[in-house]
């Protein structure tokens, strides 16, 4: 057998299939922004999903990949198994080969067998390999038995074992409906020194027989009623775990013993000064998933993907704490990770500083919570009798001490202690469901559009073109005709309208037919078709009608200008802040642009101004903006920037160059020269997540309008100051200082007023049932001063009941305040007094037993209010005496 490094095995796999005519396709991002059904990329086929569904076409019919994957959160979640088994990971690489109609079962099996057993390839012993097939898939069974010549005793049929027809470990399906088919799994026998029985038997969960490759044969389309319709072009999707095959070829039984993990575990041991194998494995696994997730744009947060990332980071930190690590250590593992991952970590290397900063910040924020929470959990477990931690205590640890429930559960599991999930389920519902809710992404391909629909886009060169209506959709239903005032989606065979993509909004305009005019308010992509969304303003529109499609030129020009400005912005940011700046999102609107990018701190005002200066310099240079079609390799050699999570599958990519300043891969529309932009102005810079900043900017006429508004504002303020604007800032500062002086004098006057009012009120105190009582009126006193008066009198007298009625002499409204010292609240309460007064005189209010308020009381006779107050107090005291 081969004994290559993991990096060499990865390349060997890709080289093998490349020699067999497969296109090597780069790994997609761990976050698929084009597939709302996925929390994370969890298999090699994810980036080809639309191809299998018939919504996308590639220029190649077979491909091979080494796909980075995450399984932590959502349907596929291996997180809690990491550290307790030899083969589960949160992050792993899936090697795969794919056929989109180029070949099927026989060729796929022959290719797999050649790679696994060929002398110049993996050279595995044939007698160590077992295979499984779906129970009724005789075709696959016979290929293994008659063409590959595997002994029949090592070919295992697996039937339906999940409670319904075609629900089996050996029958793959994308969903309840859609593409599906049988699969054949290949197992490696590690030898009888390990526990485990052959696949298909009760003992298959041991470590002796390990699945190393799954060959999926997508040959049916499952209907709503469960019937299977054969596909015209069956496909192949295979997946081999790189870490698993590396363990086989490096002659080890655990994935954590392969070269990559051995080096990472050593690095973890170095930074934690520990040798605890289980925790070292957990941390080594988690640094891979966390670093690559941050690199792909995920940041720790309280929901969605960010919550899952936070979960993984904190689990790693907790294991570090168990090893004795008290200082931040996790971020220090990014550098050794980059070293061991080789070319797979090229992007991560470019963003190393940012990734380290995000991980370090999260670790430092969590450290205090962890130490306090773990101490309290230890106290609880020490006193625990039995083997179950009750749910109320688990919730208290979270609510009071901030210890996440998943850490409580993890720690308890290590001690064979169960957590009463039913006990804390209701109280923890929101927190516990965050990751789960994040994974409930809607599964909605636009199935109403035929997968054969296709629109040719002419809008790079034309804003007006002729076309034919090929489809109409009204209320999600295909129709033959639409009429006046109906809102619909129109599909044309040719269109100049740009469909929303790449952050650029869709075009608007008009589609004119002989008998109708359709107002387009937006344009979106539906697979290979472009849908024109809008309303029929006149007449009718039918399938087959010849039409003239005309884009709103003013709006398109504004959008194009802002798109070009976005490219200038990214290059300026990378020039000023560093190459770690990577686009994390964008919105190109006709009135403004928005650009999200990776950067670990807020930009200084001087930096924002410098970015504006750089961009406006390029605008004044009036650089030519041009596009070229070339291979991806050629574009990369030119230094073209690509969108982080976008896959460029065409043999030719579109490269947009702005003079010598910017080169990017882009499919959007753009200005002809930078001078068309006119002016660039940043309206805001803010943080939207840890390590992610957002800039919003305006250009051209909108920027000029903003400058005019600011200029007018300065002019108006200057006129108020009777100033020419030359020293306006000094004038404003002088005014601020003057205001502060006046406020200080005002506070002094208020203090004097309070003292005077207290002196007057103190002479009005009477006794009622042996208790000091003050009932009095005030005029035009602010509520805050009333509260201050009450507090001061309570402090001076020690035991007193105070009710003050303040009348506003302008509107006649009366505000009341009642105060009772602590020693009297068992006899009379401020809130009871106010409640009774509101019932009598109206108004609104409330409070506590020691202080309460009422406002908006309208009365013509304040003396009546005061008289009634005295009666209330007397009654309350009498009632309290009778009760005692």
UniProtKB/Swiss-Prot annotation:
Keyword Transferase: no
Cofactor(s), names only, from the UniProt record: Zn(2+)
TM stretches of this protein: none
Principal subcellular localization: cytoplasm
Reaction catalyzed: tRNA(Ala) + L-alanine + ATP = L-alanyl-tRNA(Ala) + AMP + diphosphate
InterPro entries named among the record's database cross-references: aa-tRNA-synth_II/BPL/LPL, Ala-tRNA-lgiase_IIc, Ala-tRNA-ligase_IIc_anticod-bd, Ala-tRNA-synth_IIc_core, Ala-tRNA-synth_IIc_N, Ala-tRNA_ligase, Ala_tRNA_ligase_euk/bac, DHHA1_dom
Single GO biological process annotation from the record: alanyl-tRNA aminoacylation
Cellular localization per UniProt: Cytoplasm
Note accompanying the cofactor annotation: Binds 1 zinc ion per subunit.
Source domain of life: Bacteria
EC number(s) on file: 6.1.1.7
Entry keyword set: Aminoacyl-tRNA synthetase, ATP-binding, Cytoplasm, Ligase, Metal-binding, Nucleotide-binding, Protein biosynthesis, RNA-binding, tRNA-binding, Zinc
Top-level EC class: ligase
GO molecular function: alanine-tRNA ligase activity; aminoacyl-tRNA deacylase activity; ATP binding; tRNA binding; zinc ion binding
Positions bound to Zn(2+): 563, 567, 666, 670
Cellular component, GO annotation: cytosol
Function: Catalyzes the attachment of alanine to tRNA(Ala) in a two-step reaction: alanine is first activated by ATP to form Ala-AMP and then transferred to the acceptor end of tRNA(Ala). Also edits incorrectly charged Ser-tRNA(Ala) and Gly-tRNA(Ala) via its editing domain.
Domain comment as written in the entry: Consists of three domains; the N-terminal catalytic domain, the editing domain and the C-terminal C-Ala domain. The editing domain removes incorrectly charged amino acids, while the C-Ala domain, along with tRNA(Ala), serves as a bridge to cooperatively bring together the editing and aminoacylation centers thus stimulating deacylation of misacylated tRNAs.
UniProt-listed NCBIfam families: alaS
Protein name (Swiss-Prot/TrEMBL): Alanine--tRNA ligase
């Amino acid at each position: 057998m081969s004994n290559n490094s993991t990096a060499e095995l990865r390349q060997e796999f890709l080289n093998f299939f490349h020699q067999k005519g497969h296109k090597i396709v780069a790994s997609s991002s761990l976050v698929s922004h084009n597939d709302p059904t996925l929390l994370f990329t969890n298999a090699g086929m994810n980036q080809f999903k639309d191809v299998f569904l018939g919504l996308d076409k590639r220029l190649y019919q077979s491909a091979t990949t080494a796909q980075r994957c995450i399984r932590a959160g959502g349907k596929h979640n291996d997180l809690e198994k990491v550290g307790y088994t030899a083969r589960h990971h949160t992050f792993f690489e899936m090697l795969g080969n794919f056929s989109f109609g180029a070949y099927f079962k026989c060729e796929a099996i022959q290719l797999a067998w050649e790679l696994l057993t060929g002398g110049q390839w993996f050279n595995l012993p044939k007698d160590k390999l077992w295979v499984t097939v779906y129970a009724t898939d005789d075709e696959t069974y016979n290929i293994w038995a008659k063409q590959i010549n595997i002994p029949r005793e090592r070919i295992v049929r697996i039937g339906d074992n999940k409670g319904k027809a075609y629900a089996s470990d050996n029958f793959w399906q994308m969903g309840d409906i859609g593409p599906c088919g049988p699969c054949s799994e290949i197992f490696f026998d590690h030898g009888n020194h390990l526990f485990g029985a052959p696949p298909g038997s009760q003992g298959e969960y041991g470590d002796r027989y390990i699945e190393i490759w799954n060959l999926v044969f997508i040959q049916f389309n499952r209907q709503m009623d469960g019937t299977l319709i054969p596909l015209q072009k069956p496909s192949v999707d295979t997946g081999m775990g790189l870490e698993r095959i590396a363990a086989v070829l490096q002659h080890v039984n655990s994935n954590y013993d392969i070269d990559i993990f051995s080096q990472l575990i050593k690095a973890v041991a170095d930074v934690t000064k520990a040798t605890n194998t289980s925790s070292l494995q957990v941390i080594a696994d988690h640094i891979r998933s966390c670093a690559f997730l941050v690199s792909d744009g995920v940041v720790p947060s309280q929901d969605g993907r960010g919550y899952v990332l936070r979960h993984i980071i904190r689990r790693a930190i907790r294991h570090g704490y168990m090893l004795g690590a008290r200082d931040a250590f996790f971020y220090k593992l990014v550098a050794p990770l980059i070293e061991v991952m080789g070319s797979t970590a090229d992007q991560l290397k470019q963003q190393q500083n940012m990734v380290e900063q995000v991980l370090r910040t999260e670790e430092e924020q969590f450290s205090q919570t962890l130490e306090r929470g773990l101490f309290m959990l230890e106290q609880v477990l020490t006193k625990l009798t039995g083997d179950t931690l009750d749910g109320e205590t688990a919730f208290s640890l979270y609510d009071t001490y901030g210890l996440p429930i998943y850490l409580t559960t993890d720690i308890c599991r290590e001690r064979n202690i169960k957590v009463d999930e039913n006990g804390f389920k209701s109280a923890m519902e929101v927190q516990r469901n965050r990751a789960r809710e994040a994974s409930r992404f809607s599964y909605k391909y636009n199935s109403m559009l035929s997968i054969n629909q296709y629109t040719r886009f002419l809008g790079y060169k034309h804003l007006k073109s002729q076309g034919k209506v090929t489809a109409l959709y009204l209320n999600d239903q295909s129709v033959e005709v639409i009429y006046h005032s109906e809102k619909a989606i129109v599909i044309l065979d040719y269109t100049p309208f740009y469909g929303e993509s790449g952050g650029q909004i869709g075009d608007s305009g008009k589609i004119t037919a002989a008998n109708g005019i359709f107002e387009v308010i937006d344009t979106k992509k539906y697979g290979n078709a472009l849908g024109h969304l809008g309303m029929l303003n006149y007449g009718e529109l039918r399938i087959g009608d010849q039409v003239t499609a005309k884009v709103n030129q003013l709006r398109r020009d504004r959008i194009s200008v802002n798109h070009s400005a976005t490219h200038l912005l990214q290059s300026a940011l990378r020039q000023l802040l560093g190459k770690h700046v990577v686009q994390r999102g964008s919105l190109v609107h006709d009135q403004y642009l928005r650009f999200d990018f990776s950067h670990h701190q807020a930009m200084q005002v001087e930096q924002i101004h410098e970015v504006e200066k750089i961009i406006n310099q390029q605008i004044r240079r009036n650089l030519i903006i041009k596009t070229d079609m070339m291979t991806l390799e050629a574009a990369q050699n030119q230094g073209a920037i690509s969108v982080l999570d976008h896959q460029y599958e065409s043999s030719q990519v579109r490269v947009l160059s702005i003079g010598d300043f910017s080169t990017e891969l882009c499919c959007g529309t753009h200005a002809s020269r930078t001078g068309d932009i006119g002016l660039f102005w940043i309206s805001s810079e803010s943080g939207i997540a840890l390590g992610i900043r957002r800039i919003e900017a305006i250009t051209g006429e909108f920027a000029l309008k903003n400058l005019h508004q600011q200029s007018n504002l300065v002019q108006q303020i200057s006129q108020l100051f009777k100033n020419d604007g030359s020293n306006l800032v000094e004038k404003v500062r002088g005014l601020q200082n003057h205001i502060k002086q006046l406020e200080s004098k005002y506070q002094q006057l208020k203090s004097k007023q309070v003292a005077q009012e207290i002196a007057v009120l103190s002479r009005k105190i009477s006794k009622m049932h042996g208790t000091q009582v003050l009932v009095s009126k005030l005029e035009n006193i602010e509520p805050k001063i009333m509260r201050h008066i009450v507090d001061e009198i309570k402090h001076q007298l020690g035991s007193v009941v105070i009710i003050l009625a303040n009348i506003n002499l302008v509107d006649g409204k009366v505000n009341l305040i009642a105060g009772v010292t602590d020693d009297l609240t068992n006899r009379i309460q401020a809130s009871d007094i106010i409640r009774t007064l509101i019932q009598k005189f109206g108004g609104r209010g409330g409070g506590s037993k020691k202080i309460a308020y009422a406002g908006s009381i309208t009365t013509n006779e304040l003396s009546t209010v005061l008289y009634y107050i005295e009666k209330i107090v007397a009654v309350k005291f009498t009632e309290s005496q009778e009760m005692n």
